[in-house]
């Protein structure tokens, strides 16, 4: 059995990656490369991964898919910054029954999310699984996950040991 016999459209996958390469010429390999940041005495890398879960249902209702890409980046980056790390880069994972324009819309959001977070998208994976999931009429079969890495000076890690009753909590919102 080959890819075509299993229902995987290699040409659609290659076209999808080509569209992404127009915006990100460095992607497309089997890994993402990122230079080690300078200016740290004892740098610690911090990583976080997350998925969008049932938020996909909101996209289905409104037929708007770019916002879920922004949200995916934000959730991963938010996990990384909780310890004081500066986010550096992001990788995405899309699993779907069929590569469709929905995937392009999601990636537009991922790119926007990376721009808003001030980080680079250095790679990812788009997996087409036609025998395991129906085509994405409304994205029913789409699963999204992301992974982000940041860096923090070892002596500046926020780990909660110094949080005390009465401390002020600040909340910021970007409008």
Where are these regions (language model features)?
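Short, structured beta-strand/loop micro-motifs enriched in basic residues and often containing a Trp
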Residues: 147-154
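A glycine-rich phosphate/pyrophosphate-binding beta-strand-loop-alpha-helix module
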Residues: 63-143
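N-terminal small/glycine-rich loop or linker at the start of catalytic domains
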Residues: 42-62
């Amino acid at each position: 059995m080959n890819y075509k016999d299993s229902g995987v459209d290699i040409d659609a996958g290659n076209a999808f990656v080509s569209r992404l390469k127009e915006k990100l010429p460095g992607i497309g390999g089997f890994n993402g490369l990122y230079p080690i940041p300078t200016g740290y005495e004892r740098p610690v890398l911090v990583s976080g991964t997350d998925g969008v879960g049932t938020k996909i249902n909101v996209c289905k209702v409104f037929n708007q898919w770019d916002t879920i890409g922004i949200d995916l980046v934000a959730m991963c980056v938010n996990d990384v910054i909780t310890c004081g790390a500066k986010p550096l880069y992001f990788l995405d994972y899309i699993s779907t029954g069929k590569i469709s324009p929905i995937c392009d819309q999601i990636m537009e959001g991922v790119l926007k999310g990376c721009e808003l977070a001030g980080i680079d998208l250095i790679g990812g994976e788009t997996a087409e699984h036609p025998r395991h999931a129906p085509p994405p009429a409304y994205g029913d079969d789409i699963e999204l996950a992301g992974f982000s890495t940041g860096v923090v000076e070892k002596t500046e890690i926020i780990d909660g040991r110094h949080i005390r009753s009465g401390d002020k909590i600040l909340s910021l919102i970007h409008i």
